């Protein structure tokens, strides 16, 4: 089972305004839908405010984290269920052993809670290169996430601003990472200060060495 997160952010790191998306980007909504439905038996995880904003999303199991909402039912063969905590949710998922991918879709407190528990393997970020008026912002990614890939859409938001689809991957202990074409990309501007001692092996210019995230400084943009 994979635990991933997906979010769209603006140039000023905003993700919401008045509990809604501050922009309309059909391309990104299709991207979100295709990923979260995907193949297999997938579920989305959201907080109460996100649930109030987007409602129940079809063709996926919907899990809502809330201390005040309490319901559980099946709709079109998909489970709609609330949980009071991440621990309760994970216990249920582990006991059922019935899910291929879990997708965390917001809001900001939910992202941060899962990051603090080191539960997110892949983080899918749609970056819209434009400033928006926002009242909710994305929390910082820990510095032990490496950029796995970045694709720039051939289309422009408002015919002016670029749309970037970026995937970050969490470094695991003793992980071997191979960098091709002498290119290594690190998260530099968005990070937490409390970095864990995660040792892993890197291969760079056909040479291997063991390092940890504190001393990984051979990066290029």
Stretches with model-predicted labels:
Residues 174-180, 202:
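A short beta-strand micro-motif
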Residues 181-184, 207-209:
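Short acidic/polar mixed-charge low-complexity motifs
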């Amino acid at each position: 089972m994979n635990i991933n997160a997906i979010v769209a952010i603006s140039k000023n790191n905003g993700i919401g305004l008045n509990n809604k998306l501050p922009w309309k980007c059909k391309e990104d909504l299709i991207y979100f839908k295709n990923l979260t439905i995907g193949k297999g038996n997938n579920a989305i995880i959201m907080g109460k405010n996100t649930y109030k904003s987007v409602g129940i999303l079809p063709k996926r199991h919907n899990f809502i984290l809330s201390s005040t909402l309490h319901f559980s039912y099946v709709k079109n063969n998909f489970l709609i269920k609330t949980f009071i905590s991440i621990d309760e949710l994970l216990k249920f998922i582990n006991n059922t052993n019935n899910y291929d991918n879990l997708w965390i879709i917001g809001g900001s407190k939910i992202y941060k809670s899962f990051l603090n528990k080191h539960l997110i393997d892949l983080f899918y970020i749609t970056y819209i290169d434009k400033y928006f008026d926002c009242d909710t912002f994305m929390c910082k990614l820990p510095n032990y996430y490496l950029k796995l890939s970045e694709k720039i859409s051939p289309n422009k938001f408002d015919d002016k601003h670029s749309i970037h689809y970026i995937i970050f991957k969490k470094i695991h202990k003793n992980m071997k990472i191979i960098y091709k074409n002498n290119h290594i990309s690190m998260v530099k501007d968005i990070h937490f200060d409390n970095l864990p001692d995660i040792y892993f092996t890197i291969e760079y210019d056909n040479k291997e060495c063991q390092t940890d995230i504190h001393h990984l400084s051979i990066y290029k943009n």
